Amino acid sequence: IGVLFSGGVDSGAVLLAINHELLVRGDSPARLKAFTLSVDGEGEDAKQARDFLRATELEMLGETISVARSRVDPLEAIQVIEDYKPLDVECAAVVLALLQGIRDDYPGWRYLVDGDGGDENLKDYPIEANPELTIRSVVNNRMLYHEGWGVDAIKHSHTYSGGLSRGCVRGYQPARHYGFRIFSPFAVPGVISVSEAIPFAELTCGSHETLYRLKGDVVASGI
């Protein structure tokens, strides 16, 4: 089992949970690897990943996949995911580079897990980056970042799931392209349902900083 690992909250929680479950089952942690991309030997993810693994005493799980900058190809990403939204294309381009590196090193590897959906579930996006948003509009709209992810509601359309389609495709299609099967525990209905029931307004009291801390507090409590 490979975790697409940045050392952040979402992929970190996934790695710790899978490692725990393997130990509970009596399986070897050697079945698990944390794959981190490094482009031209640079990037914050590789350092953050090393720091996380060191702090959790799981350094033996880490593996850095190093690629040349030319390997991160947005045009290839557009062809694979058949989409044009800049953030989704950027995400897919990076994932494709990482997955090609994993496939080159491990021709028989099949299963991958990532933390996609963690930001949406706990509204962990900078409000300041979008002039149309306010703290009130974010915390009072339970499906703001779950465009199409709703469990009991339809946000836009009965036939188009919007953000959910994009979220699935940007992970699923690159994985399929290289012969992997990928899964995110943050993108299943049960978890999304819990996230939509969180009383964000009451917990944050109108504070940006409190909202940004909330994700770490919730995930840390669960872990």
Where does each model-flagged region fall?
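ATP-dependent adenylate-handling active sites, centered on carboxylate activation for C-N bond formation
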Residues: 1-222
